[in-house]
UniProtKB/Swiss-Prot annotation:
Gene name tied to this protein: hisI
Organism: Mycobacterium tuberculosis (strain ATCC 25177 / H37Ra)
Matching HAMAP family: HisI
NCBIfam families to which the protein is assigned, alphabetical: PRK00051.1
Protein name per Swiss-Prot or TrEMBL: Phosphoribosyl-AMP cyclohydrolase
Entry EC number(s): 3.5.4.19
Entry cofactors: Mg(2+); Zn(2+)
Keywords: Amino-acid biosynthesis, Cytoplasm, Histidine biosynthesis, Hydrolase, Magnesium, Metal-binding, Zinc
Pathway: Amino-acid biosynthesis; L-histidine biosynthesis; L-histidine from 5-phospho-alpha-D-ribose 1-diphosphate: step 3/9
Functional summary from the UniProt entry: Catalyzes the hydrolysis of the adenine ring of phosphoribosyl-AMP.
GO terms of biological process kind: L-histidine biosynthetic process
Keyword hit for Amino-acid biosynthesis: yes
Cofactor comment text: Binds 1 Mg(2+) ion per subunit. Binds 1 zinc ion per subunit.
Length: 115
């Protein structure tokens, strides 16, 4: 799948050709995870509404939930003001984190709210 040239022109990729993808749960607003996307992963996500990312360690695309069943249906995708990150709003099925937790940010609180 090929990324729309108008979208591709707005992206500011890192040296590896990737942009940061921040994933937020629709409804709760929870930040679920942060991942990477190359042009092909973003194009596939936009065309199928299946969250697709790029694994730096495996050097390949992966569809969230293809193995685990913990899928992400993409409700919307937004580009940030600098063009170097996208925000995906998703409907999450199962845990978003590879540990099985709902969010990758469930593990350690470094600073508690000061309510």
């Amino acid at each position: 799948m090929t990324l729309d040239p108008k979208i591709a022109a707005r992206l500011k990729r890192n040296a590896d050709g990737l942009v940061t993808a921040v994933v937020q749960e629709r409804g709760s607003g929870d930040v679920l995870m942060v991942a990477w996307m190359n042009d092909e992963a973003l194009a596939r996500t936009l065309q199928t509404r299946e969250a697709t990312y790029y694994s730096r360690s495996r050097a390949e695309q992966w569809v969230k939930g293809a193995t685990s069943g913990h899928t992400q249906h993409v409700h919307s995708v937004r580009l940030d003001c600098d063009g170097d990150a996208v925000l995906l709003t998703v409907d999450q099925v199962g845990g978003a984190c590879h540990t099985g937790d709902h969010s990758c940010f469930d593990a350690a609180v470094l600073l508690e709210p000061d309510d």
